Curated annotation (Swiss-Prot):
Keyword DNA repair: yes
Biological role: Involved in DNA repair and RecF pathway recombination.
Organism: Polaromonas sp. (strain JS666 / ATCC BAA-500)
HAMAP family, A to Z: RecO (MF_00201)
Name of the protein this chain belongs to: DNA repair protein RecO
Amino acid sequence: MATKRIGDEPAYVLHRYDWSESSLILEIFTRQYGRVALVARGAKKPSSSFRPILLPLQPLHIAFGGDAEIRTLKSAEWQGGHVMPTGDALLSGYYLNELLMRLLARDDPHPVLFDAYSATVQLLASQSVDTLQLALRAFELRLLRDIGLLPLLDAETATLAPLEPQARYVLVAEAGLRQAHDDDRNSLPGVQWQALQQALGDNALFSDTVRACIPGLNELKTQLRALLHYHCGVKVLKTRQMMMDLQAL
């Protein structure tokens, strides 16, 4: 059987680890093929053209081939466009990568999610704290929606009853969206949930999702964190624990 070769594919490195003294195994997020595992032969050699560009959060165009579970990286070209994020923005980028590693199956294409990821990475590179938080919340929503883990945000999950614009609702991992109880913190009014649902529509831009997160930014952070931890099967993600440890120093 002929080996399939893919060329000029937009991609980002999610994770990399040693495979031999000179080579790396890469987890790559591609636009048309989803998350794929590739071996980069000789990438650790000082003379390798791969060495300076196989970095996380950097836009690449790659070529790869093979029909095994782990295919072979043939070429990689850096696309430029922004500098490497630093500080909190860099940790936030690693957080995005951890989410994708935990929640995306291999070889499952998500081109719209790829575009949202690319837009988020560019926003992280802007170094604005406010922009950073908005970008993270918007991407979390897009990710959960794209992989089918986000309930409709304009109806109660249990009854499918439309939301009342002024009533308050909470997003709960085990139950979806429900009306808030007196002791529920971080609830949002129905009108804000409805706006978020609209901003996640098939024709909505990522910038629409970012803007829709502005009114309930703090409340969304808590609820989305709980939902993501639930679906990732962990109490705290590694990158989030790293952030908390650094803040405690």
